Amino acid sequence: LRQDPALDGAQQERVADWLRAAAHQLISYEKPGALGNNHHYWRALAATSIGVLSNDNELFRFGVNTFKQAVGQEDSNGAFPLEMARHENAIHYQSFALQPLIMIAEFAERQNVDLYAYTDHGRTIRNAVTFLGHAIADPGIVKQYTSDEQKTNFSAGDVAELEFYFARFGAESAPNSLRNLLHNPATATRVGGNTTVLAGK
């Protein structure tokens, strides 16, 4: 939006105002005290990105707090319990939940808020990434959460957000299964398109 040469300053402000209003409406659907899952995280990513764009700290803080809530829900293995309840798609939903959370962390880093270092009961978002890698390598570890046979048809697009993670921590920071899965270029429309290019900027 800020780089679109077709929009002058007044038009950019008008669009930003509309996005801000839409984001506030979006998060108004949240029920106080409700437990978050990937739907909550995706709403939080929208709020975070628009909050940064429009200098709306309330929207930005909503995203930051949602990220912290997600880390707080990780179990001792790094799994998200609400996503583990997704039967044969448990591993896929662990992956799907990480997409918005990693992107929230990236937005926050650019606002000098280090969410990657945020710890709750001894765990960080990196534990969730590690669990995903282990589960992809050995779906049997999910049997403690669900008896359903796991779908394992993963592609680079399922973990495209990890381009940002690898750019920050190095590919060696994640299990081999994730490194082997993330072929370049990696693309996921939900997190901006070609993340290989975006993470390299």
Model-assigned labels for residue ranges:
Residues 1-112:
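Aromatic-lined, polymer-binding surfaces characteristic
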Residues 115-201:
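CBM-like carbohydrate-recognition segments
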